[in-house]
Amino acid sequence: MTIKSIISKHIKKVLNIIKIFITHEDLAIVRTSDKKVWDYQVNGIIKLANNLNKNPYVLSKYIISNMRYYEYKMYKKITASKLGFINIFINKTWLEKELTKKIKSFRLGIKKVTPKNIIIDYSSPNVAKKMHVGHLRSTILGDATARILEFLGHNVMRINHIGDWGTHFGMIIAYLKQNFISYNEINQLDLNELYQKAKVNFDLDSEFSKKTRNYVVKLQKKDKECIRIWKKIVKKTITENQKIYKKLNVTLTNKHIVGESFYNDMLPDIIQDLKTKKIAKQCNGAYIVFLNKFKNRDGAPMGVIIQKQDGAFLYSTIDLACLKYRCEVLRADQILYFIDSRQKEYLKQILEIAKKAGYISNNIIIRHNEFGMICSKNKRPFSTRSGNNIILSDLINEAIKRAKKIAKNKNKNLSNKELEYLSEKIGIGAIKYFDLSKNRLTDYIFKWDEILTFDGNTAPYMQYAYIRILSIFKKLNISMLKLSGNIILTELLENKLAIKLFQFEEIILESLQHSAPHIICKYLYELSKIFSKFYEKCSIYKSKNTKIRKNRLLLSLLTARTLKKGLFIIGISTIKYM
């Protein structure tokens, strides 16, 4: 239970007596900022009172008097402002008792929820192309969400919906044939370069375009030679991508790959089903679904093509089969898509068709967690000087290279092995955390000097904050694993730190509600700052009172464990030295 949920439960209990029924969201309970004296504030009473034609102050006073009547031990003081805000001060004794429980818990007192089957569709790069910087956000936002959901106890099905089918394979096969490149030579080729050359031919040569389309149809009809080439290209790409996932500390593996080709055998049935249900209509030889909720430029219902005149299927057909499979076979309770905001309208159309066809039941939650772009200093999509997408492996290597220089400057006594280890943990952590710390919905500017700094809300700062706490125990020669006891709060800063530590579960749930890992990043940064103030003002080394020292060590231990767990569930590694 979180403090917010307990307050909500108590207020709802009071209001239910006078037949007022509200939701947790209606109460609008907020945490204090560092400058405020209260710990929590209930803001929703004003709106509630206005809706009921009651005086907000009078209603707030009624709630407070009845909360006191129930004598809940967690409250030190509850007050009402003249406007109707309820200010809550948490009881120190209650906080001490609850934090002591957290220290004794491997999960920091956070209980697992009733599990749901949740599919997360993320990363999903195209085969025969190198992963570029544009894949970074989907990959690490999706992975962080998967980790958080698993930590809370949900059954998470990661799906890497790779683009292993479609026109680009027809282009590549046509190019290989045109240039007499044999099957055995494919492994020696740069697939990215091969794709780019094939794309130029496709755009400029109508005859080549025709051959491409013929090979696409051959692939769909399972032509043996085309399938053999296709498998070779897919395998080579997956091997390269898996190296990137491993370096990024991303939990996607080969077993999570369910590419577009997986649905091939289902596509004819999808077309037939939509025809039978009179959802798809034939138009000039193609099959189209017209959607009244979506309008084209002329104001007429938008048409979504699901099968072309030549019999070829489209991405729309694949995505419909994919949705049907996930809902009916995998029996998902929720499906979360981490795909580009530019796909928003298209995904809405696919969902609308799937609902019309009855593939999605009303109790399934489907959410498009769109995200903004990574931009360069000129606020345009982050790319090379020539305008090409930056290759993700190059970006990772550059981060490690820069981190290596920083680690070397900080500690010239590091061995080569230590230097390699640190540069990878710091560099990878830095680019991931910089992305995760930004609001998912906004674009952000990629700046190396901000990514790898030890000041502010960055991975290096967080990693250093963790090391700093470890050094306290090392200096005092005390084992963090063996330290135990009851927390006693004697100073105001200890109390502030304790409240912040207790909010960890609250933060995780809020982050998940909005699919917003930046909420966790912000919390961890604020926790580190409060601990820094606590460390400066509440002496650990100089304290002559052994009980006070032990208590402060317990708070330090809980802070370290919270930082480590918080970073872990968003995919950032901690380090023990620097």
From Swiss-Prot:
Main localization, broad class: cytoplasm
Record flagged with keyword ATP-binding: yes
Gene Ontology terms: biological process: arginyl-tRNA aminoacylation
Domain of life: Bacteria
Record EC number: 6.1.1.19
Keyword terms of this UniProt record: Aminoacyl-tRNA synthetase, ATP-binding, Cytoplasm, Ligase, Nucleotide-binding, Protein biosynthesis
Assembly and binders: Monomer.
GO cellular component, one term: cytoplasm
SMART domains for this protein: Arg_tRNA_synt_N, DALR_1
InterPro entries: aa-tRNA-synth_I_CS, Arg-tRNA-ligase, Arg-tRNA-synth_N, Arg-tRNA-synth_N_sf, ArgRS_core, DALR_anticod-bd, Rossmann-like_a/b/a_fold, tRNAsynth_Ia_anticodon-bd
An annotated Gene Ontology molecular function: ATP binding
Entry similarity comment: Belongs to the class-I aminoacyl-tRNA synthetase family.
Catalytic EC class: ligase
Localization annotation: Cytoplasm
Catalytic activity: tRNA(Arg) + L-arginine + ATP = L-arginyl-tRNA(Arg) + AMP + diphosphate
Motif ('HIGH' region): 125-135
Name this protein carries in UniProt: Arginine--tRNA ligase
NCBIfam families documented for this protein: argS (TIGR00456)
